Structures are given as C-alpha cells and as structure tokens.
C-alpha cells in the first residue's frame, strides 16, 4: 500500500493500454500504491478513474475521472471498512452493472451471461429460461444443461 511503484508492477501482467479503463480505489485518496498506479496508467494511455471519500485528495488530481463519496468521518477512526468501504462497494456495483448492460450481458433485467457455478445459480438460470421461453421447468433445465449458459439456451429457441 505504501509502495508507489508496486501498483503498476502488479498491473503489468494485464498489458494496460489505450483500450483499458483502470479505476483506483482509496478511501483516503492518498494511498501511494493507487496514486502511483493511476499515474502510470495515464502514461500508458488508459482511461483512469478513482473512487474515494476525500475531496481534493491526490487520487482525484491524478485520475481523469473522480467519483467522491462524501460520507463524513468513520464511527471508529481509521476503520474505512465501515462507511467509506461500503460507499465504495455500492459505487463499484453500479459501475459493474452498467458495464454488463453496455456489453449486452443483460436481457431485460436479467443477467444472461452469469456463471452457473452452483445449484442456486443453476436454478436461477433455469427459471430465466423457463420464463423467457414459456416452457416447463424441467425442459428449461434440460436446455440449460445442454447448452451450458442461459444465453445459449435462449438462443437455441430463438
């Protein structure tokens, strides 16, 4: 967290460039790891943003786009996992949801490209296929298992 170069080193395996967007997250807005990484991402031509809870902090000056959630002081001083962390997570959820919609991974209000990694998600996917196609649960489940994804199951009947 204190090493200004380590953030960029950690990003090297992703070959950051002009096609990328990098969002730095720092409750205080001054974390050297985040600030340094964003500076180097700017140099590489990436679009940069930040999410912080401290207006006018170093990270807001480095990022091309800043989101500042002014939540006030933490109830327990220094415990940024409380208000700051919660606010930042909500913002990240909004950003990731918007990205998934823009990428076409949502049909209507359903995430059709979800990973079917457990029984609960398989059931959810089956119900999506069932409702969208107007077929019985068992038929939808068979389609889902055959095609391996909600999107492919839906497209198989389009």
Predicted features and spans:
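Glycine-rich phosphate-binding loops that contact phosphosugars or nucleotide phosphates
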Residues: 1-90, 99-103
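Short, amphipathic alpha-helical interaction segments embedded in low-complexity terminal/linker regions
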Residues: 99-158
């Amino acid at each position: 967290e204190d090493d200004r170069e380590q953030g960029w080193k950690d990003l090297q395996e992703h070959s950051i460039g002009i096609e990328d967007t990098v969002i730095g997250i720092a409750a205080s807005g001054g974390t050297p790891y985040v600030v340094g990484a964003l500076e180097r991402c700017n140099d590489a031509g990436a679009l940069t943003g930040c999410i912080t809870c401290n207006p006018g902090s170093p990270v807001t000056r480095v990022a091309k786009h800043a989101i500042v959630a002014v939540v006030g002081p933490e109830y327990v001083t220094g415990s940024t996992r409380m208000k700051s962390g919660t606010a930042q997570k909500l913002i990240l959820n909004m950003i990731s949801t918007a990205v998934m919609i823009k990428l076409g991974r949502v049909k209507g209000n359903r995430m059709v490209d979800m990973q079917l990694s457990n029984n609960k998600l398989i059931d959810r996917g089956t119900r999506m296929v069932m409702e969208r196609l107007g077929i019985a649960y068992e038929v939808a489940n068979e389609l889902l298992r055959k095609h391996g994804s909600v999107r492919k199951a839906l497209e198989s009947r389009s």
